[in-house]
Regions:
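Charged docking surfaces used in two-component/phosphorelay signaling
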Residues: 15-23
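Short hydrophobic/Thr-rich beta-strand motif most characteristic of the beta2 strand and flanking loop
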Residues: 25-32, 40, 103
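Active-site beta3 strand of CheY-like receiver
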Residues: 45-51
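Receiver (REC) domain active-site loop signature in two-component systems and cognate sites
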Residues: 56
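C-terminal output helix
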Residues: 89, 107-116
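Short, glycine/charged-rich "phosphate-handling" switch motifs in NTP-dependent
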Residues: 100
Length: 121
């Protein structure tokens, strides 16, 4: 079973995304912020995909993505970002850091599943 780590400070969104992925047959781990997510990704390098919120306390999703790419154990894990903002500067930073895609919230379940099935390793 492929494992996905969902990182979002909104419990509602985290649960919605986790439920969608769980019902599709993925094993789902959850974290509340980028620092917790980074620790979990490092502890679980067998994660198939990361789904990160951009705007979170403690450590945001872009900072987490950049830190993941610096660690050989997590550098190759595909990452999808979720955001309420579609600013060019955020998209450029996400691309440069190696994000495989991003969604504007609220995320449509069918779009999430299509991307997850394509990217999960």
């Amino acid at each position: 079973m492929k494992k996905v780590l969902v990182v979002d400070d909104s419990e509602t969104i985290r649960l919605e995304v986790s439920r969608t992925l769980g019902q599709a047959g993925f094993s789902v781990l959850e974290a509340r912020d980028g620092a917790e997510g980074l620790a979990m990704a490092t502890k679980h390098p067998d994660v198939s995909l990361l789904v990160l919120d951009v705007n979170m306390p403690v450590m945001n999703g872009l900072d987490m993505l950049e830190r993941l790419r610096q660690d050989p154990t997590t550098a190759d894990i595909p990452v999808l970002l979720m955001t309420t903002e579609a600013e060019d500067r955020l998209i450029e930073r996400a691309k440069k850091a190696g994000a495989k895609g991003w969604f504007i919230k609220p995320v449509k379940p069918e779009m999430l599943l299509m991307a997850t099935n394509k990217l999960a390793r």
